[in-house]
């Protein structure tokens, strides 16, 4: 008998949770996975935004975000000066990755691919009630008012998710 065989009574602790890639649809809150994804979209403060430079090398940076359920898009704050390279990369290639933090087991993780663009239509972040509600306590802990944070990161990126890879 192979040491890799398992029966249904023994958990397989050596394997990562099953993952699958699917076209993105707004998560269904009536399913356990959909409920968990929506909770993370609403509550997590940071995701990792991955862009690709002209040579094809990926670059991942943490970013504050707001899930816009009405439009099924992400609103991501970006600084104009420090993120200049990222903004150029998005103009050259709008395909991006959005990675959410995971635990050491790799369970409860999901990665999205999408298309990003600089948004000129969104108001300043301090004028968006959902943004203020989500980030006010965080910024106050680091010594910034929500208005100061909006001045530091004035560029709005909109990301439309295309695919999702999830492990649940």
Features from the language model and the residues they span:
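Hydrophobic-ligand binding "helix-grip"
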Residues: 87
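Charged, gly/pro-rich active-site loop segments
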Residues: 2-29, 107-168
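Short His-centered aromatic/hydrophobic patch
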Residues: 104
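Short, basic/aromatic recognition patches
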Residues: 19-48
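Short beta-strand segments
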Residues: 44-79, 96-100, 111-112
């Amino acid at each position: 008998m192979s040491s890799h065989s398992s029966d249904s009574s023994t958990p397989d602790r050596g394997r990562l949770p099953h993952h699958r890639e699917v076209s993105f649809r707004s998560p269904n809150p009536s399913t356990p996975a959909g409920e968990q994804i929506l909770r993370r979209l609403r509550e997590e403060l940071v995701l990792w935004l991955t862009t690709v430079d002209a040579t094809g090398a990926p670059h991942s940076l943490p970013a504050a975000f707001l899930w816009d359920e009405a439009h099924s898009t992400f609103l991501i704050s970006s600084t104009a000066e420090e993120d200049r390279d990222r903004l150029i990369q998005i103009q050259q290639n709008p395909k991006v990755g959005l990675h959410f933090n995971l635990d050491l087991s790799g369970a409860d993780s999901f990665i999205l691919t999408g298309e990003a663009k600089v948004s000129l239509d969104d108001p300043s972040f301090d004028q968006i009630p959902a943004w203020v509600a989500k980030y006010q306590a965080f910024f106050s802990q680091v010594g910034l008012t929500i208005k100061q944070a909006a001045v530091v990161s004035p560029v709005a990126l909109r990301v439309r998710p295309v695919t999702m890879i999830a492990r649940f």
